Amino acid sequence: MQAKAVARTVRIAPRKARLVIDLIRGKEVGEAVAILRHTPKAASPIIEKVLKSAVANAEHNYDMDVNKLVITEAYVDEGPTLKRFRPRAMGRASAINKRTSHITIVVSEKKEG
């Protein structure tokens, strides 16, 4: 059985979020939370929140044991891009892309043995 949590349209660039999500993929939940707490990246608290949501979903919806949970899937997809303009010299303007992310974490109970 798998439990899933998704954070959609989070205001962080997918490239930056993937750096953090790669650290926790395949880890046990307790170890993953410890890694996220000690990772000095802006994506860390956001991903930790999604992970806690996935754990809560597993516990509440599927009656899974929290101590046996493992992150089976963790990925970041690109969300809609917010397009902004920055004024430049001589009346010009240049485009600024504010990228967003869809963060997905799937947890399941690890097999015995």
Curated annotation (Swiss-Prot):
SUPFAM superfamilies: Ribosomal protein L22
Family annotation (PROSITE patterns): RIBOSOMAL_L22
Listed GO MF terms: rRNA binding; structural constituent of ribosome
One Pfam family cited in the UniProt record for this chain: Ribosomal_L22
Disulphides: none
NCBIfam families: rplV_bact
Function: This protein binds specifically to 23S rRNA; its binding is stimulated by other ribosomal proteins, e.g. L4, L17, and L20. It is important during the early stages of 50S assembly. It makes multiple contacts with different domains of the 23S rRNA in the assembled 50S subunit and ribosome. The globular domain of the protein is located near the polypeptide exit tunnel on the outside of the subunit, while an extended beta-hairpin is found that lines the wall of the exit tunnel in the center of the 70S ribosome.
Protein family according to the UniProt entry: Belongs to the universal ribosomal protein uL22 family.
Name of the protein in its database record: Large ribosomal subunit protein uL22
Organism for this UniProt entry: Geobacillus sp. (strain WCH70)
